[in-house]
Amino acid sequence: VKKKGLIVAIFFGTIMLTSLAAGVLLNNTPSPSENTEVTLTGTPADNFPDAQRAQFCGSGDAKSTTFVKEYTIPTVCTNPLAIVTDYNGNVWFAQTNTGKLAKFDPNTASFTEFDNPIWPKNGRSMMWGIDYSPDGSLWFTDESYDSVWKFSTQDEKYQRIGYPSEGDSLPQKLKVDGSQIVINDFTGNKITFLDPTQSNDNLRYLSLPSPVNGSVTGDFAIDTDNNVWYTNWVFQQGGILIKFDQEGYRNSVAIFSGTLSVLDYIEIFQLPFELLTPNGIAVSDGMIWLADTSSSSIFNFDPVTQQFTQYVTSDPKISTYGNSTGIIKSPISRPYWIEPNSAGQLVFNEQTANSIAILDPKSESLVEYMIPSKNPSWGDCAPDSDCGLAQIFDFAIHNDKIWFTEWVENNIGVVDTSIALPFGIELDSKDVSLVPGESKNLSFTISPQQDLSDVSLILSNPYNFLDVTSNVSDSFQLDPGVPSSMEVTITASDDAIPGKYKILLGAQIEDVSISKFATVTILP
């Protein structure tokens, strides 16, 4: 377990916005502290020294905004992570500091926590994957003990199943897919397909080895043709996108008596060099979407043209990182996991922007909801400031609600996307063409539906050969029903590379950011 913690820390240690407790993120025990005094409370907080309890167990009460409502888990310091909803809209989540599952009933706003009698005493594990099965059971992963767990909602009993591994393994995301359970083994470098219909503790399984040695295997998504898409990547060195034809493979196995190579049923696509940490992946309307946790970007892949398109988020608000010492020069949002909703929009969590975002590919719009709770231990925060991160590591979509967990604030929360947005954004033109060295202006209109103060512009652009500027640099106020036109200047440098690029234009208040993408074409 210690070896695994070190390996994972190497990959994820730089994902934190600051160096504060960076290596602790996926370890099973808290990091060494100068003050190791532990005041026993008889609660899960006892797994942390007194000096680290505010950092890992929560720094304040549950909060709300117009769009977000949080709920505090009754048991302190549970470190909630993987989350899912059942068919009745109940919310289920795994507690990494207790080994329990918990249920939240949105109708009564009540929690029920289910003791896990076979969980090791004082055990801790990152539980990244959870899904609900039609038979009323919940399946979830456990990286510390290389396990897959089944919880029956009928008899409220847990069953632990050893995860098939050779050497290091880290069962991460999990999906119930028809009659099988699919899991990515992050450090074991494979995708595993389990048959859950067996009653014993040793389930039949198929392991799909990854084609890149020394890499990790990221999240996966399944398209309408039952192809499995996933990533292999090497930390800070890039990687590949993989398509596995599982139907073709299984059909061949059924009719062929010899030995088949699973790798004969995969296609490989090189990831763009800008995409270094493709954690999350989703399929929507035939397109593949990837979340890059090393940047502020989401990438779209078109399987027909085999082209990638980069979509950038807004910059994190200063309330998420503080920058009281001035050490943070270029804050990034770090999109982590990504899932489609029923409308084909892409929902993703922005880890270091403390936000849940919705990208609409049809309207090319982006809405980012700020989560109100912030733990100052995870930012460069001044004393007594409203600053930091709640560490939103997972979410679940149910109708127009997005439920999420706050790993270091001991809360769950919900974004209500049915609530009307306070303003709209319209671009005068969605397309701009430039030759290298040229500048052009583009205008967009902000249409407020209510009084708005402390409004600021969003001018996001991930390319060092493009510059997007405006003469509006300070925050401003908007009156309801009075549209405001904003003009920006887009400049291509002399060495700009020909191609099509997306920039993000919009506005933000503290609770929500609303933007639209414009396409900039650099001509030869």
Predicted segments, located by residue:
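Blade/loop signatures of beta-propeller domains
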Residues: 37-67
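Blade-level signature of beta-propeller repeat domains, shared across WD40, Kelch, NHL, RCC1
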Residues: 382-422
